[in-house]
């Protein structure tokens, strides 16, 4: 993390052994002299297992963004850097990342993190690439929708993809629509551009 100078959390060699496989879903625990906490929308610290914004502090933390005082004030509060990433800490202090705060989908009053849905879809070996996002919806506020690229020779249909999700995530997190495309829009670094995905979805509706 650039704003923190280097890493904030890590998994030790022992935590990578077979008996501790569940830890591999986390990004580890804070390194020496660093602290991590999770804050809810009310600014109060969340209980273990409760999702909120990840805030961090440590000796390598930046002083400010160069000549950007307003941007600095938004993220540097009371000696803590607000990452705008969402996640939770378990009872043992391991950090799990749910996704970016700005990417969170609010559908029917429920908070849904695209990364969780994307990870389920990636479990299907016939899906090569996936992007999940919220699309404005008059009834739900936002509708969970997904765009996927299938592997060569796959004949998966959108409905089969939705069916695959059942039992793996809550029903309200299952994409209401799935689009099968030849490719996903990407930026110059090869990262999926969700703004372009959303634009293309709107054009198809």
Predicted regions and their residues:
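Acidic/polar alpha-helix N-cap and adjacent early helical turns
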Residues: 199-205
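Bulky hydrophobic/aromatic packing residues
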Residues: 1, 49, 139-140, 194
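AMP-binding/adenylate-forming catalytic core of the ANL superfamily
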Residues: 58, 63-64, 74, 86-173, ...
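Conserved AMP-binding/adenylate-forming
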Residues: 2-95, 101-104, 117-118, 127, ...
């Amino acid at each position: 993390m650039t704003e923190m100078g280097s890493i904030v959390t890590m998994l030790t060699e022992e935590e990578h052994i077979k008996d501790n496989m569940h830890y591999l879903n986390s990004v580890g625990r804070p390194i020496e002299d660093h602290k991590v906490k999770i804050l809810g929308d009310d600014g109060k610290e969340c209980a273990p297992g409760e999702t909120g914004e990840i805030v961090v502090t440590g000796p390598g933390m930046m002083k400010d963004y160069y000549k950007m005082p307003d941007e600095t004030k938004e993220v540097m509060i009371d000696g803590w850097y607000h990452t705008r990433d969402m996640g939770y800490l378990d009872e043992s202090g391991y950090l799990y990342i749910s996704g970016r705060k700005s990417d969170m989908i609010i559908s029917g009053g429920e908070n849904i993190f695209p990364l969780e849905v994307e990870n389920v879809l990636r479990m299907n070996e016939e899906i090569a690439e996936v992007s999940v996002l919220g699309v404005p919806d008059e009834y739900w506020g936002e509708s969970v929708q997904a765009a996927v690229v299938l592997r060569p020779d796959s004949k998966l249909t959108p409905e089969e993809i939705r069916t695959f999700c059942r039992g793996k995530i809550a029903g309200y997190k299952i994409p209401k629509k799935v689009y099968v495309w030849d490719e996903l829009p990407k930026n110059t670094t090869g990262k999926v551009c969700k703004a372009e995905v959303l634009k293309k979805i709107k054009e198809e509706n």
